Amino acid sequence: MKRDFLGRTLAVIEDLSVEEQMFLYEKTRELKQRWYSGEDVSDFRIKKRNVGIYIVFVEPSTRTKESFINAAKFHSGPNVKVNVFDSEHSSFNKQESYTDTFSMLTGYSDYSIFVVRTRLEGVCRLLERRISEFASRNGIEVPSFINAGDGKHEHPTQELLDEYTFLEQNGFDNSFIHVALVGDLLHGRTVHSKVNGLKIFKNVKVDLVAPEELMMPEHYVEKMKKNGFEVRIFSSIREYLDQKDVAKIWYFTRLQLERMGEDILEKVHVLREAVTFKKEYLDALPEGVKFYHPLPRHKVYPTIPNFLDTLPLNGWETQARNGYWVRIVLLSMFGGALEAPFDTSKKEEKPEEDFIIPAPITHGSKGVQKEGKRGIKPIENGTVIDHIAKGKTPEEIYSTILKIRKILRLYDVDSADGIFRSSDGSFKGYISLPDRYLSKKEIKKLSAISPNTTVNIIKNSTVVEKYRIKLPPTIYGFEELRCKNENCITNPAHGENASPSFVRNEKGQFICEYCETPHSFEEIWSI
């Protein structure tokens, strides 16, 4: 049974299970207590030989970068070298890909831990996959990657220190938490990480306090509800304090003007007013409230104004210091210094659900002949794809037929297609492929292009096999796939030659596996 965390990646907070996160928090608590009482903490230091810790910040940062540098220096010694990567004068400026850069860096140590911050989203997930393959090819130990913030996607190590700080305030009781998230919930990646980070608490109540223009994206709100959180929404601090059930943990974020469009910037004064705390609000707060903030604060327009610095409300200073301790422990785990009392193997993927379902065959050849009478010549042998985009308009159906032909390369000379009216009055598409049998792989591809179709295998003018195809749980491996997020690492403009892949959620949306942007089925296709 694996008990170490070597080779693990933290791209999103869910890459650590709740059990693994709680282990990290308990070890952080232990480290702090032993450090401040003057006890030996050497067992937290990485002892594995020839380890390289690389701090690679392609996006500027002060707190996160310095926190990680100092956490890495805690481990620095004969066995561990700390490298602060100068991205401004690096091969990135020579248009080298992330994959090539990190492949070469991986070869300079027996084992590597990379701490990566980028404007592009999903970089650590890409590196986890690509560099694992590189390491396997070259007999190198698979490295670890830690996401130190990627665009407006996630900031999992900030989430770790936030949750640790919340636990401290709660006396390390994780039975319940009531937290208010206040500020720019649209662009703030730290609040996006809380969608899953708060799952360490058994009962969760979240109040979202932001005007509509800055409200948390709907797919994150839905995910909170799916996680069992009670979620309430308020448009301003004033509205929030007008009701009596006020949280004792407030988590503020700054307005990220650099990520906003012109339409939002025109309203910035009104938006800022809605989420900035004022002196007049103090009397409405319940006893024991603490304010937190991932920092930095805007020096002119802080959502937590400076008059609060000296009040007992100030929890953000302790929160910031906790980042050092949490990141030391995270590096201890990923560097092999700390082992868990439970299995730390990466959990197996769920088996893919069966989405190609054999269907009963009725009237063997009758159905084929029937289609022939409506304009398509019946075939003796081959494949008939039926019920294409059933219920859609003729224009949409024909577009789907063209998509199927292009992606599956169904350019057979004798093939035919058409649009017919079903017995229920709706339209459906139809492709007839004489002497051509679709392979199982092609049928799987078809399910991704046009779900809910029917595939008929015909021999001697008789339907001998029939399949009904459902929407697959994952879609990948097509050149025509595109993530609509321009900042996703898979976007062709970024030159990483990364193929998008999508996972279907319970609502039928397809979530990019790199940046977690939700898409409709139609949106994932570039044709």
Curated annotation (Swiss-Prot):
It comes from Thermotoga maritima (strain ATCC 43589 / DSM 3109 / JCM 10099 / NBRC 100826 / MSB8). GO terms for biological process: 'de novo' pyrimidine nucleobase biosynthetic process; 'de novo' UMP biosynthetic process; amino acid metabolic process. GO terms for cellular component: aspartate carbamoyltransferase complex. This is Protein PyrBI. It is an enzyme of class 2 (transferase). Residues 1-342 are annotated as: Aspartate carbamoyltransferase. It catalyses: carbamoyl phosphate + L-aspartate = N-carbamoyl-L-aspartate + phosphate + H(+). It holds the Pfam family PyrI. InterPro entries: Asp/Orn_carbamoyltranf_P-bd, Asp/Orn_carbamoylTrfase, Asp/Orn_carbamoylTrfase_sf, Asp_carbamoyltransf, Asp_carbamoyltransf_Asp/Orn-bd, Asp_carbamoyltransf_reg_N, Asp_carbamoylTrfase_reg, Asp_carbamoyltrfase_reg_C. Keywords: Metal-binding, Multifunctional enzyme, Pyrimidine biosynthesis, Transferase, Zinc. One of its GO terms (molecular function) is amino acid binding. The keyword Metal-binding applies. Residues 343-357 are annotated as: Linker. In the N-terminal section; belongs to the aspartate/ornithine carbamoyltransferase superfamily. ATCase family.
